[in-house]
Amino acid sequence: MAMTAREAAWTALQRWRKNGAWSDAALHAVLQNAQLEPRDAALAARICYGTLQNLTLLDHYLSVYCTTPLQKLEPKVLDLLRLSAYQIVLLDKIPPRAAVNEAVALCRKGGCARASGLVNAVLRRVAEHRDALPEIPGAGTADYLAVRYSHPRWLAQRYIDAHGYAFAEQALAANNADAPACLQVNTLKTTADALMASLHADGIEAEPHPWLPDALLCHGGNLADARAFADGWFYVQDA
C-alpha cells in the first residue's frame, strides 16, 4: 500500500527523533522513497514542520487529555499523537475526524496496534474541545510564552528581562510564524526563471532565494494548486 502524507510525516518525525537528523533532511529522505503526489508531499511537509514548531504547545494539550503521562508512552505513539493534534488544533482545512481516523489506522499499521484505543480516545477529546482548549497557565510570564510559542523558557525570560513582556511575545510569535516556502527547482524539467514566471501567472508571489542556487522563496498563494506543482517543477524544502 502506498504511503500517505500523514504516514510520511510520521515516519519523518520518527527519523528526526531517533537519529537527531535535521527536520528537512529527515523529511527529504522519507519523501524520496514515498513517491507522493506533489499535493500530498506538501501536506506531509506542512504537518512535519508544523508539529516540530509547536511541540511544547501540543504536549500541553495532549497532557490534559491523556491519562497516561506522555513520557511513558511509546515514543512513536507520542509522535503520532503530536502530529495528529497539530492537524486538529492548528490546521483549519483538515477535518478533525479525518485526522483521528487516519491516526488510528496508522497506529495499527505501524506496529503499535495496542495503543490504537488510547490514540483514538485522546484525539477525540482534543477534537471535541478544539474550540475551547485548556488555558495555558502563567499568563504574563515566561512560563506561558515558553508553552504558547514552544520556545525554551530561558529565552523567553531573557527577552522579557531585556525588552519587556510585549516585545518578548511579539518576538517569539514572529520566530514561530510560518516562514516563506522555499522551493528547490527541479532543473531536470525547468529553470528558476521559468518556474518563477509560472508561479506569477498563477497568482503566487515568488522571488529568487538570496543565497541558494536554483531556489525560490514564495509568499502566499496555494502551491498545491499551481500548475508547476502538478508538473513536478519544484520540491518544497526547509531553508
Regions found by a protein language model. Give the residues of each.
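Class I Rossmann-like S-adenosyl-L-methionine
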Residues: 1-228
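Conserved SAM-binding loop and adjacent beta-strand
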Residues: 230-239
